[in-house]
Amino acid sequence: MFFDVLGYENSQSSIKINLDLLETNIINIFILIIILIYLGRKFLGNILINRQNRVITSIRESEERLEKSTIRLNEAKNQLSSAQIIINQIKQEAKNTAANVKESILKQGKTDIERLLLNTKNYIYNTELQIKKQIKQQIAALALQKVQSKLKDELDNNIQQKIIDQSLAMLTIRNK
């Protein structure tokens, strides 16, 4: 059947080409193709133009989105680098602050130790003074007791009276 349209004849022994244009309908097929091209050209042309316009619009929108995305990406990179700079500054400030705090604590500790040493030295000095004073008082008390006991043993009433009179005379002379 297909071969009939093209003008081929099937015989038992050979294939023959039918050159009669009217029998093979080649003219009709050719006319049909021309009509389809003429009428379909507008229809297919409009479809293809619409499709082309949609593709071009999609490409433009994609390019615009790409540009916007690239701009946002660059902004994000700039923000990231700014954030990294700020983070590095914060780290450096933290190191400096830690060093300053450490130095301050060491100075304060040294000052506290010096103050404690001074307080301890003062306490020891004052304690020594009190102990010396107590020792002197005890020595004086013991000396007085010893002198009193010696005087009681060696002095009689007349000598005691003379000493008292001399002491009173000296006091009266001083008071005048």
Swiss-Prot record:
GO cellular component assignments: chloroplast thylakoid membrane; proton-transporting ATP synthase complex
Chief place of localization: plastid
Membrane is among the record's keywords: yes
Key words of the record: ATP synthesis, ATP-binding, CF(0), Chloroplast, Hydrogen ion transport, Ion transport, Membrane, Nucleotide-binding, Plastid, Thylakoid, Transmembrane, Transmembrane helix, Transport
Membrane-topology descriptor: Single-pass membrane protein
Domain of life per record: Eukaryota
Record localization: Plastid, Chloroplast thylakoid membrane
A molecular-function term among this protein's GO annotations: proton-transporting ATP synthase activity, rotational mechanism
Residue intervals passing through the bilayer: 19-39
Family: Belongs to the ATPase B chain family.
Function: F(1)F(0) ATP synthase produces ATP from ADP in the presence of a proton or sodium gradient. F-type ATPases consist of two structural domains, F(1) containing the extramembraneous catalytic core and F(0) containing the membrane proton channel, linked together by a central stalk and a peripheral stalk. During catalysis, ATP synthesis in the catalytic domain of F(1) is coupled via a rotary mechanism of the central stalk subunits to proton translocation.
PANTHER family hit by this protein: ATP SYNTHASE SUBUNIT B, CHLOROPLASTIC
Oligomer status and interactors: F-type ATPases have 2 components, F(1) - the catalytic core - and F(0) - the membrane proton channel. F(1) has five subunits: alpha(3), beta(3), gamma(1), delta(1), epsilon(1). F(0) has four main subunits: a(1), b(1), b'(1) and c(10-14). The alpha and beta chains form an alternating ring which encloses part of the gamma chain. F(1) is attached to F(0) by a central stalk formed by the gamma and epsilon chains, while a peripheral stalk is formed by the delta, b and b' chains.
Other comments on record: In plastids the F-type ATPase is also known as CF(1)CF(0).
Protein name: ATP synthase subunit b, chloroplastic
Source species of the chain: Galdieria sulphuraria
